[in-house]
């Protein structure tokens, strides 16, 4: 028999970013535009990589998967958020909340390790160019994307099961625009110590281990670049890393201050602002950053416009 303090939960209420009807209409237009740009930019990037023979390299193989994750990442949150902007009942079903929470955690972790894989690729390309084709073989590249997918989704499932194993009672209003872990935990009326510790350990390990791989890779990369005698050679070597470094800085900078701390009312309010950046702006900016700072991508876009890019399909 259920305790009278416990509730059979069928849906949650998402408080979103604002309750001002006028501002909601404006935000609907803004986030719809961001979402459409995100879809167009990332789909275009995937299409370029799949159809242009000049982009059939490990670096663009990883970038294609990064674009795919960004599409999934944005699509996991945006449609429901847009619907709630125009709806009086800003609800999400229990199953929908579970799925959104699982996918969000899984895709975030996957993206962390994709960025680490891309750093390893740049390390091999710059520090061991003669062995690049053998060390970054097709099988190795597939492994470097398969492992992050598996690790991300296993962690996402375990973390989400821990969250939804909690008992929810009283208010079911989630102080966020999607089903995020910290505000969900604050609704629980059962012991949350195990969940909080698990969230802290997984987030801390994921952030620190993936960032360690990236920093160590760039330590060797910068050492190799500074040994290049010509300024032109140094500039060319660094330019191959500039886009990746920009994305890493944006992504890690926003997420570091969100998950490696216990949830509280203040941290949840701050995390809503931070989440807008990495949930909407980061997936939109990633293909733009790679397009504007990469001559190969610019050339591929020009060839696509002229109808000359459909050469062969990548695996």
UniProtKB/Swiss-Prot annotation:
SUPFAM superfamilies: Family A G protein-coupled receptor-like (SSF81321). One of its GO terms (biological process) is sensory perception of smell. One of its GO terms (cellular component) is plasma membrane. Residues 47-54, 121-139, 218-237, 293-315 are cytoplasmic. One of its GO terms (molecular function) is odorant binding. The chain crosses the membrane at residues 26-46, 55-75, 100-120, 140-160, 197-217, 238-258, 272-292. Glycans are attached at residue 5. It is a multi-pass membrane protein. Odorant receptor. Belongs to the G-protein coupled receptor 1 family. This is Olfactory receptor 5M10. It comes from Homo sapiens (Human). The lineage of its organism: Eukaryota, Metazoa, Chordata, Craniata, Vertebrata.
């Amino acid at each position: 028999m259920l305790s009278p303090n416990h509730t059979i939960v069928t849906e949650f209420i998402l408080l979103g970013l604002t309750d001002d009807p006028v501002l909601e209409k404006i935000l609907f237009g803004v986030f719809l535009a961001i979402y459409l740009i995100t879809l167009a930019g990332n789909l275009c990037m995937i299409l370029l990589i799949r159809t242009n023979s000049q982009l059939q390299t490990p670096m663009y193989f990883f970038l294609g998967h990064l674009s795919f994750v960004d599409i999934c990442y944005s699509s996991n949150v945006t449609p429901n958020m847009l619907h709630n902007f125009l709806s009086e009942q800003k609800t999400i079903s229990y199953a929908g909340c579970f799925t959104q929470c699982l996918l969000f955690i899984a895709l975030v972790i996957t993206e962390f390790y994709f960025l680490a894989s891309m750093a390893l690729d740049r390390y091999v390309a710059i520090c061991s160019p003669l062995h690049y084709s053998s060390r970054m073989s097709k099988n190795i590249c597939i492994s470097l994307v398969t492992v992050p997918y598996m690790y991300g989704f296993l962690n996402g499932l375990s973390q989400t099961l821990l969250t939804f194993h909690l008992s929810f009672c009283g208010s079911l209003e989630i102080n966020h625009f999607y089903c995020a872990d910290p505000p969900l935990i604050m609704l629980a009326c059962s012991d949350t110590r195990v969940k909080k510790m698990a969230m802290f350990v997984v987030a801390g390990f994921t952030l620190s281990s993936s960032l360690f791989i990236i920093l160590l890779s760039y330590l060797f990369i910068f050492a190799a670049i500074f040994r290049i005698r010509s300024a032109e050679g140094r500039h060319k070597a660094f330019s191959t890393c500039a886009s990746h470094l920009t994305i890493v800085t944006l992504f890690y900078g926003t997420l570091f201050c969100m998950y490696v701390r216990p949830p509280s009312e203040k941290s949840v309010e701050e995390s809503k602002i931070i989440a807008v950046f990495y949930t909407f702006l980061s997936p939109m900016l990633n293909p733009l950053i790679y397009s504007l700072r990469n001559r190969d991508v610019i050339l591929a876009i020009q060839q696509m416009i002229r109808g000359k890019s459909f050469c062969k399909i990548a695996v």
